[in-house]
Amino acid sequence: MYKRQVSKAVYESIKNSGAKIVDATCPFVLKIHKIVKDASAEGDQIVIIGNEKHPEVEGIMGWSETPVHVVDTVEKAEKLKLDKSKNVRVVSQTTFNYKKFQDLVEIIKKKEYNICISNTICNATEERQNEARRIARRADAMIVIGDSSSSNTRKLYEICKTECQETFYIQTLSGLELDKLKSSDCIGITAGASTPNNIIEEVYTNVRRKLCTDVR
């Protein structure tokens, strides 16, 4: 089985070796590969909103026939310089912070390039982020559950931390310090897409039982 979250060169190398390929890639990622491949073939400059070191972004970069620019901060967006005589195609890492994506795109748009923007953030990711933001605004404390290396969970943490100062990032129940939550009347819980349901339930049940507070 091959998850096509790598460059075109790697994909072609495996294909040419004669190995059987079972492509189990998320369709959202495949869509980005096609957008970048087709746009760059037309000579468009490619801008990816995302983390340059993330495997997904590294893979997307490999599908472009023209130079790729990766932007993930306001500073990089402001410093971005492109050829105004050529079209610009903007895509996003599927798990990128949606609000941050919008903010960075607005900065790039002000540069008056001939730009085409493709919001390629996964719908499920966007909905999860919006829900986490809504809960964090009403909570006294937030618990974000997920693997420390998970991109989408880190984004959830950043969003919650912005809305609720008392936000805690844990991988399992063992990482939760209940003493820090005792003064909270309302505690919100959210989790990354790949976090097992049993871990989420365990955290929820323990917080509810031991703190006897409003948990959302």
What positions do the PLM features span?
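Short amphipathic alpha-helix with an adjacent loop that forms part of the alpha/beta core around
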Residues: 75-84, 175-183
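A general structural motif
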Residues: 69-75, 94-101, 120-130, 148-149, ...
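Internal gly/pro-rich beta-alpha loop/helix module
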Residues: 21-22, 35-41, 46-74, 78-82
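Active-site rim loops that border cofactor/substrate pockets in soluble metabolic enzymes
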Residues: 107-141, 146-147, 154-169
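Short helix-loop-beta junction
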Residues: 15-20, 65-66, 105-115, 158-166, ...
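C-terminal functional extensions of proteins
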Residues: 141-151, 155-163, 167-216
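Conserved small/polar residues in nucleotide/adenosyl-binding loops
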Residues: 1-2
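Internal active-site segments that recognize and position negatively charged phosphoryl groups
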Residues: 78-111, 132-135, 144-145
